[in-house]
Amino acid sequence: MRIILLGAPGAGKGTQAQFIKENYGIPQISTGDMLRAAVSAGTELGLKAKALMDNGQLVTDELVIALVKERIKQDDCRNGFLLDGFPRTIPQADAMKEAGINVDFVLEFAVPDEIIVERIVGRRVHAPSGRVYHIKFNPPKVENRDDVTGEELTTRKDDQEETVRKRLIEYHSQTAPLVSYYQNEAKAGNAQYHKIDGTQKVSEINAELKNILG
């Protein structure tokens, strides 16, 4: 079972990735984690990636594909894998296909931009403990104070509205075209494509995923 999750930042992919991992016993492959692991292990690919990053350059698609190929040969991927944060662009999706990395399911989590902004901008964190609140959906007992310590809550830089809207613009220009790409792949019989309403309750999305994945 090889799965790709699509959806804007804040669409709930992380929560559902956790659910899929726990229920289907397949690893989540994050390209960011994979790059960091390769760099710290000093592998040939890791050294190439480090050289690019040290020069302030982006890691090439070829290098990421090579890392993905290497990663999915590992034992824990024999029943499948869940790709997180990759592919992000059509050239990456094409390169993946050319490298013989096939997928069974592409799951798109659709959430309107305004709801995503509300979800992310309303987050408040207690940095020392990692506890996360939301001013509307999961408020602290005392406004802007951590429930346990009473310390002040903060907003992460990534959760500020301007940053969120920039990330959404980037998503719509780069990653959203993958929706039609994978819909065409599904029509050609190369994968199953499912669009999921990401505004539903977590339990409802879980039930829908069980229905799709079996």
Curated annotation (Swiss-Prot):
It is an enzyme of class 2 (transferase). GO terms for cellular component: cytoplasm. The keyword Metal-binding does not apply. The keyword Lyase does not apply. GO terms for biological process: AMP salvage. Belongs to the adenylate kinase family. Consists of three domains, a large central CORE domain and two small peripheral domains, NMPbind and LID, which undergo movements during catalysis. The LID domain closes over the site of phosphoryl transfer upon ATP binding. Assembling and dissambling the active center during each catalytic cycle provides an effective means to prevent ATP hydrolysis. This is Adenylate kinase. It comes from Proteus mirabilis (strain HI4320). The gene is adk.
